[in-house]
From Swiss-Prot:
Record region (Inhibits hydroxyapatite formation, binds to hydroxyapatite and calcium): 17-46
Effect of S24A: Decreased phosphorylation by FAM20C
Modified residues (Pyrrolidone carboxylic acid): Q17
InterPro entries recorded: Pro-rich
Function (record text): PRP's act as highly potent inhibitors of crystal growth of calcium phosphates. They provide a protective and reparative environment for dental enamel which is important for the integrity of the teeth.
Protein name, per record: Salivary acidic proline-rich phosphoprotein 1/2
Family annotation (SMART domains): Pro-rich
Major subcellular site: secreted
Post-translational modification remark: Proteolytically cleaved; PRP-2, PRP-1, PIF-S and Db-S yield PRP-4, PRP-3 (protein A), PIF-F and Db-F, respectively.
Species annotation: Homo sapiens (Human)
Glycosylation positions in this chain: S33, S38
Region: Disordered, residue numbers: 16-166
Biased composition range(s): Low complexity: 48-61, 68-82
Pro residues compositional bias, start-end: 83-111, 137-159
Amino acid sequence: MLLILLSVALLAFSSAQDLDEDVSQEDVPLVISDGGDSEQFIDEERQGPPLGGQQSQPSAGDGNQNDGPQQGPPQQGGQQQQGPPPPQGKPQGPPQQGGHPPPPQGRPQGPPQQGGHPRPPRGRPQGPPQQGGHQQGPPPPPPGKPQGPPPQGGRPQGPPQGQSPQ
């Protein structure tokens, strides 16, 4: 069971990462929206290459030396954008992992029920009371039944009825 769960978890996690990477490329503006400055630089990159990629790169490098090289090649920018998604993927991972622990929690609950720990205690208490009840219950009815008919006059009625058919 554990192997199956682990394999399923790995498959789900890997597929989630693949989806995150695909989504990260599509959601580039959303990821970049975290920083207003980065949006402006990216806009410059987008506008710059069509006008003249060489001119836009030096200007971007002059504006921000750190961001300049990263902005120059759009591929590197893509890697940076992919960087934030992995953190997003990580938070998504724990929820999935968190989902797996509940099933184990359900399993421990199951074994006690299957183990019958609750059942034997239930059966044991029920056993003695039932036995005691049977012992106490049956004795009163038998004495009550024989005692009941005689006072009613069943004896006098019985003999005449028995004699008449004979």
